[in-house]
Amino acid sequence: MLGALQATEVIRFDEEDRRAIEGLGSHPVVRVLADALKFYFEFHQADGLGWCAYLHDPLVVANAVTGKFASTRPLAVDVELAGTLTRGQTVGDELGRWGKKPNVDLLCDVDARGFIEHLMATLRGGLG
């Protein structure tokens, strides 16, 4: 399963979400997550994107396990190894020109609020 930035960047944590996580208590996972969010909030603010953080990997994992937070579609992808601007970038054959079978399920139509609510409920229920 692949979560391209167009899909995963709809999981945008704002200040209210950050405070809600901090309010979950003093469990080490809460502290680590709160610190990570603060780092990314500051990073995105400095980069001109605002006081926010995006949670890419947790969305992809949660959807792979539950199938509840995004639809998927098959896509052939490969990693660009020769490009001077795109070296190391995952690229997809959106037009089917490569003649290769799809090798990933690409996330589409993400339920951002549903995922955030699921993540918060998981953290509340699993940190006891």
Task: Identify the role of each PLM range.
Residues M1-G128:
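N-terminal acidic, glycine/proline-rich low-complexity segments
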